């Protein structure tokens, strides 16, 4: 690289070096070579495209995905809202697939905090709620389930109503539990859900 800086293979070599440093989790060294490609070899289209894609991993290693999009904008590269949404959502799904609830909550919170109108807002709240419930953090879980119940006709609506009803009932909050169970009976097509909602309402009325 140093002996033949103008060789047309140098841009490819820099990309490969950047990729190697990324595999070693060395974001700073990777960035140095990737930026060199973009600054010194702007006409190497394929290598420029690869360098831009790999820079996403640089910022991911720094746990700063939003910084990646600021960087793109600073270089005059167009960023679609959907692309940014998908990139910030990907770590949430990866954490869920790995069964890592702590990381899932962290990534879902980051996603919600850094996307103005998140496309997967309901899913993020649902994943967080389930993780909190698994950890027996019921108040935190209820916050997210309740959020979902306030946005009807989503994929997790009946599940959120059911869990919110059970959590509030266990907390002796029979008034709110009754509301959740009543709505669940009205909207669910599942026999088990309807049976649970009727039973829940019966006991709520009993204790009120």
Roles of regions detected by a PLM:
Residues 1-208:
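Acidic, polar-rich low-complexity tracts and alpha-helical solenoid repeat scaffolds
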């Amino acid at each position: 690289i140093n002996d033949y800086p103008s060789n047309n293979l140098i841009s490819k070599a820099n990309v490969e070096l950047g990729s190697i440093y990324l595999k070693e989790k060395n974001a700073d060294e990777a960035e140095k070579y990737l930026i060199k490609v973009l600054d010194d070899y702007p006409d190497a289209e394929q290598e420029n495209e690869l360098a831009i894609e790999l820079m996403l991993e640089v910022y991911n290693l720094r746990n700063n995905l939003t910084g990646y999009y600021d960087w793109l904008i600073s270089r005059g590269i167009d960023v679609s809202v959907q692309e940014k949404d998908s990139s910030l959502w990907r770590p949430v799904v990866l954490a869920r697939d790995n069964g890592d609830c702590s990381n899932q909550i962290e990534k879902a919170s980051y996603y919600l905090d850094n996307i103005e109108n998140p496309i997967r807002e309901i899913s993020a709240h649902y994943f967080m709620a389930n993780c909190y419930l698994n950890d027996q953090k019921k108040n935190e879980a209820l916050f997210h389930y309740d959020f979902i119940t306030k946005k009807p006709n989503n994929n997790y609506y009946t599940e959120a109503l059911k869990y919110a009803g059970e959590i509030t009932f266990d907390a002796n909050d029979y008034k709110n539990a009754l509301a959740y169970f009543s709505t669940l009976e009205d909207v669910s097509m599942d026999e088990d859900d309807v049976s649970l909602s009727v039973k829940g309402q019966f006991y709520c009325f009993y204790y009120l």
